[in-house]
Design a protein with these regions (language model features):
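N-terminal post-signal-peptidase region of extra-cytosolic proteins
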Residues: 39-40, 59, 64, 142-144
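Thiol/disulfide oxidoreductase modules built on the thioredoxin-like
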Residues: 121-129, 136-190
Length: 190
């Protein structure tokens, strides 16, 4: 199993360091971040894949299971305190989290390749009120290999109320763009 994860990691790093969105490398982490443009995708209900069984420990030391959010729409954002584009999108994510809580939209962060003190400082600086999983080795991101480039952040996934991957943003998620994506993946009621 270890060699399989190592193989996925090598493929992810080799295949995701450039592309249409561009990438830059943070020297302190060896991790890439997306620069330039972004792309948004909405997956049709019939083609949505089940989200992997993500579990882990939050920066606050609590256990979190993605499965326990079934019935809610989940916005899963992958970030790092060292990532300039992540810092740029953080205020929009925090504001949307506050605005959409009553609509059963839950935000979860996944902090990539960070020291805990730096990650907690990021959350304080940007007033992030939602939980973030600590993912220092990139294991959570690798679970989404094939859906997103796990070696380049930021990226954001929208998980529908049935636990399926309904949409994604690769690159900086803007307030208006992410709000529209969330609206587009929710079931129509009328």
């Amino acid at each position: 199993m270890t060699w399989l994860l190592a193989g996925f990691a090598a493929a992810a790093v080799a295949g995701c360091s450039g592309g249409a969105t561009g990438a830059s490398t943070a020297a302190s982490s060896g991790q890439s971040f997306v620069t330039g443009s972004y792309s948004t995708t909405v997956f049709r209900p019939g083609s949505r894949l089940a989200a992997p069984p993500v579990t882990g420990t939050t920066l606050a030391g609590r256990q979190l299971r993605l499965r326990s959010y079934r019935g809610d729409l989940v916005v899963l954002n992958f970030w790092g305190s060292w990532c300039g584009p992540c810092r740029q999108e953080a205020p929009a994510l925090a504001a949307l989290d506050r605005r959409l809580q009553s609509d059963r939209v839950r935000f979860i962060g996944v902090d990539s390749h960070d020291q805990q003190a730096a990650a907690l400082a990021f959350e304080r600086t940007f007033e992030v009120g939602y939980p973030s999983l600590s993912d220092p080795g990139g294991v959570v991101a690798l679970q989404f290999y094939g859906t997103v480039p796990p070696a380049s952040i930021p990226f954001t996934l929208v998980i529908d109320r049935s636990g399926r991957i309904a949409g994604r943003v690769i690159g900086i998620a803007s307030y208006s763009g992410l709000k529209k994506l969330i609206s587009d993946v929710q079931p129509r009621t009328s």
